[in-house]
């Protein structure tokens, strides 16, 4: 069964996608449901903010990307930026540009991936927006996090002889992208095809280090 987004309207869709969301972080004072989220961070913390915009046809291809995987990946790429600066992600806002090609059920699937990522990394969804799009799907996520003021890691802080550490399999996600673009099929993130799974559902392993 397909439900057109127009049958719910913008606010009805937002209510459906965010139903049952609970705030887990102490810095999240008020989330979805008002004109703005309310956040409160301790004075000894530095607040970190990052935004990523993903555009259909540029950053992902709906031919082979399941919506749940896309939602998950859209969230964790933002978490990654916060972790990279030695911070902890706390909240996100999610904004979507949707063409008429997408149904309410499609957005349920996309949001299930976003919510799964937030549950795994203890991040609160505190707001967002939806609008119509003439060119497909656009996903913009802003992530807010915190770090101890004297422990923020900047790119320009790298020095000669510093040890560079990486996690995961370098190049695996790119190899997965090449395979998916060649085959042009949805592999459903099959773990029997490791590189395609790595590309479809990126994991932010820094949180586990």
Task: Give short role names for the model-derived ranges.
Residues 67-91, 112-120:
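Small-aliphatic-rich amphipathic alpha-helix that forms the alpha element of a beta-alpha
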Residues 54, 89-185:
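Glycine-rich anion-binding loops of enzyme active sites
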Residues 33, 65-69, 73, 105, ...:
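Residues at secondary-structure transition points
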Residues 38, 78, 86, 125, ...:
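Residue-level signal for inorganic ion chemistry
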Residues 1-66, 94:
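Extreme N-terminal cap/leader segments of soluble proteins
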């Amino acid at each position: 069964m397909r439900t057109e987004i127009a049958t719910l309207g913008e606010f009805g869709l937002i209510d459906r996608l965010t139903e049952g969301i609970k705030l887990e972080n102490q810095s999240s004072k008020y989330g979805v449901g008002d004109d703005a989220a309310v956040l409160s961070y301790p004075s000894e913390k530095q607040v970190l903010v990052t935004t990523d915009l993903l555009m259909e046809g540029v950053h992902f291809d709906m031919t082979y990307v399941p919506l749940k995987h896309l939602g998950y990946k859209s969230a964790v790429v933002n978490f990654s930026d916060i972790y990279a600066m030695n911070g902890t992600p706390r909240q996100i806002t999610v904004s979507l540009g949707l063409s008429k090609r997408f149904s309410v059920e499609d957005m349920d699937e996309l949001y299930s991936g976003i919510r799964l990522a937030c549950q795994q990394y203890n991040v609160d969804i505190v707001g967002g927006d939806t609008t119509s799009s003439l060119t497909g799907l656009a996903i913009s996520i802003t992530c807010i996090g915190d770090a101890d003021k004297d422990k923020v890691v900047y790119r320009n802080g790298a020095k000669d002889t510093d040890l560079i550490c990486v996690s995961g399999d370098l190049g695996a996600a790119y190899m997965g992208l090449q395979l998916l673009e060649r085959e042009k099929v949805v592999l459903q993130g099959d773990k029997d095809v490791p590189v395609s799974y790595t590309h479809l559902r990126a994991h932010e392993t820094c949180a586990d280090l």
